[in-house]
Amino acid sequence: MAKLTKRMRVIREKVDATKQYDINEAIALLKELATAKFNESVDVAVNLGIDARKSDQNVRGATVLPHGTGRSVRVAVFTQGPNAEAAKAAGAELVGMEDLADQIKKGEMNFDVVIASPDAMRVVGLLGQVLGPRGLMPNPKVGTVTPNVAEAVKNAKAGQVRYRNDKNGIIHTTIGKVDFDADKLKENLEALLVALKKAKPSQAKGVYIKKVSISTTMGAGVAVDQAGLSASAN
């Protein structure tokens, strides 16, 4: 068995794995245990009551967190004409069509999000093998294929998070940085849960949001008692 580091021993002593913590207590615990030498992200894992083997029960989408994620996001947009100017005005770092595709084929991928107008998908579609494995392929379900590319750029810059359940029916995403005020982290988490509830598949039966855990990049997960969240989120 691998030897526990001093840091992990402290975390295990502080975090009761059998307990669901009030959200304020959970956030305070994360902040106390965040001793890494960088500003750790606060991540969330949401266990959903879905059968992930069935395509009609998979959950995928995007939502803008009220206080952002604390990360700067570089955006690439495939579009042309007036939309290209609108995308640039909205803050996109890279805008183009075939010229942008050529850059990507050469391995020049200095961006975090790819957005495309519908008329550009003929170009983007040829990049599936490059963008797909990196989770960058534009998709209308998460708002990255849209005629309104300027709005999509603004959303990405404002702290939009994209979510998709894994094979175990769990959503993994981020809700901010450990130096965020506790209220901001709580409100970001509540906004995410509201979005997930709106995305609930009609075929999903029983308890939908089964478990919510938050953690820092280098820390252990802390289970959150949903009763302490706003009525719309729990």
From Swiss-Prot:
InterPro entries: Ribosom_uL1_bac-type, Ribosomal_uL1, Ribosomal_uL1-like, Ribosomal_uL1/biogenesis, Ribosomal_uL1_3-a/b-sand, Ribosomal_uL1_CS
Record bears the keyword Ribosomal protein: yes
GO-annotated biological processes: regulation of translation; translation
GO molecular function: rRNA binding; structural constituent of ribosome; tRNA binding
Keyword Disulfide bond: no
Cellular-component GO terms for this entry: cytosolic large ribosomal subunit
Record keywords: Repressor, Ribonucleoprotein, Ribosomal protein, RNA-binding, rRNA-binding, Translation regulation, tRNA-binding
Described purpose of this protein according to its UniProt entry: Binds directly to 23S rRNA. The L1 stalk is quite mobile in the ribosome, and is involved in E site tRNA release.
Family: Belongs to the universal ribosomal protein uL1 family.
Subunit structure: Part of the 50S ribosomal subunit.
Name of the protein this chain belongs to: Large ribosomal subunit protein uL1
Organism of derivation: Salmonella gallinarum (strain 287/91 / NCTC 13346)
